Amino acid sequence: MLRRALLCLAVAGLVCADAPEEEDHVLVLRKSNFAEALAAHKYLLVEFYAPWCGHCKALAPEYAKAAGKLKAEGSEIRLAKVDATEESDLAQQYGVRGYPTIKFFRNGDTASPKEYTAGREADDIVNWLKKRTGPAATILPDGAAAESLVESSEVAVVGFFKDVESDSAKQFLQAAEAIDDIPFGITSNSDVFSKYQLDKDGVVLFKKFDEGRNNFEGEVTKENLLDFIKHNQLPLVIEFTEQTAPKIFGGEIKTHILLFLPKSVSDYDGKLSNFKTAAESFKGKILFIFIDSDHTDNQRILEFFGLKKEECPAVRLITLEEEMTKYKPESEELTAERITEFCHRFLEGKIKPHLMSQELPDDWDKQPVKVLVGKNFEDVAFDEKKNVFVEFYAPWCGHCKQLAPIWDKLGETYKDHENIVIAKMDSTANEVEAVKVHSFPTLKFFPASADRTVIDYNGERTLDGFKKFLESGGQDGAGDDDDLEDLEEAEEPDMEEDDDQKAVKDEL
């Protein structure tokens, strides 16, 4: 009997030794306990992270806050994390290509976990999970339930229907199913109608900013409701941060106007107020974004727009379609009237795109590798008598730094050639209409001709590879844009950024 008891204790000890630990309500998983955690929890959200990853560090407090909130509610949903640098087998098994990668497991299904795609704040995480595990809209039987829902999140949508089986109520539920990151509630209770000053069916979007609530007006259809929510779910002016980036770039509004404003400036409140006043006329059309130009994390964005800290406050507009296009106001005045006028003129198609260019250095053609800027690009690259091979680079790009000595040797090789020119252009400070650069370094060949031909180089990045390409007239090593490997620099180590944040970096 004693032997049996000791055996049971020993087995229990082994099981406990493999049981997941908890850090701030978040389960710590390893390969040895991953399957056990999936079996123990019906719903499990797992973050694959790296200890050195800046985005993971920024997410950590919000992730823990979400985990604690769900645990306190007695939810079946648990949050977990895996150090993918230590558990490389798990990372490979679940296709982790960047950090953080967050996957949602339901009923222990390892074949097709759902990728988490919502925002990086605790409310976003909780709302997304509840929508994935519960009804599209929570039934609100009384005023207390309604108040709890409304107070639970920055944004909540409530449908007030005296008949919850009506066609309008069904359209409302379809809209609720289409949105993952906002909680929806539905009620037929007369006391709830009275509590929120409704005397007939309606839909209200409640929010903890700006005007506090928006009442839907019009025919209740799924499409109309989604449009109404799109117009009203974000603040009139939203600050660009690590947490808000997914909301900004994941939304349907692809025209963004950005106010670069240091929080330390003396008239900060006044300039932000002017920007907000202008925003009122463009809800659902243009997203108004404020960027703290003093913040270190935002310096790359300033660089992308060709701005320096000392040039701020400043306003720029960008369209995030397939090809991004930037626009600059004609006036540097930051009054509400000027900003409003600029936006109207943009929407009317009266503003020309803004292309950045550095000043042309006096010695731009004195070295074997010629220096191109926006102002001399056309004359050099499309010279009908010259074959011009150009590297489009970024100063911070590690791949570009590795290529630099090879590119210099290539310049030396052809410095006395009668019709071959080796050149480079800093694409973070110069833009040209003829070439869209999506990754760094990008290498393009402009053969001597009158038809403005552009050939992409997709061969080996070696001196011999480049020489073969040039001696073959741009054939040996040529490739289409679709074949180009995306070699945009990631912060070392290579896997720091997840897909959402990499998209932000690609765009900004």
Swiss-Prot record:
The modification Phosphoserine is found at residues 331, 357, 427. It is found in: Endoplasmic reticulum; Endoplasmic reticulum lumen; Melanosome; Cell membrane. The modification N6-acetyllysine is found at residue 200. The modification N6-succinyllysine is found at residues 222, 271. Keywords: Acetylation, Cell membrane, Chaperone, Disulfide bond, Endoplasmic reticulum, Isomerase, Membrane, Phosphoprotein, Redox-active center, Repeat, Signal. One of its GO terms (biological process) is response to endoplasmic reticulum stress. A motif (Prevents secretion from ER) lies at residues 505-508. It comes from the Eukaryota. Residues 1-17 form the signal peptide. Residues 478-500 have a biased composition (Acidic residues). It is a peripheral membrane protein. The active site is at residues 53, 56, 397, 400. The keyword Repeat applies. The keyword Cell wall biogenesis/degradation does not apply. It holds the Pfam family Thioredoxin_6. The record marks 120 as: Lowers pKa of C-terminal Cys of first active site. GO terms for molecular function: protein disulfide isomerase activity; protein heterodimerization activity. Heterodimer; heterodimerizes with the protein microsomal triglyceride transfer MTTP. Homodimer. Monomers and homotetramers may also occur. Interacts with P4HA2, forming a heterotetramer consisting of 2 alpha subunits (P4HA2) and 2 beta (P4HB), where P4HB plays the role of a structural subunit; this tetramer catalyzes the formation of 4-hydroxyproline in collagen. Also constitutes the structural subunit of the microsomal triacylglycerol transfer protein MTTP in mammalian cells. Stabilizes both enzymes and retain them in the ER without contributing to the catalytic activity. Binds UBQLN1. PANTHER family: PROTEIN DISULFIDE ISOMERASE, PROTEIN DISULFIDE-ISOMERASE. This is Protein disulfide-isomerase. The lineage of its organism: Eukaryota, Metazoa, Chordata, Craniata, Vertebrata. The gene is P4HB.
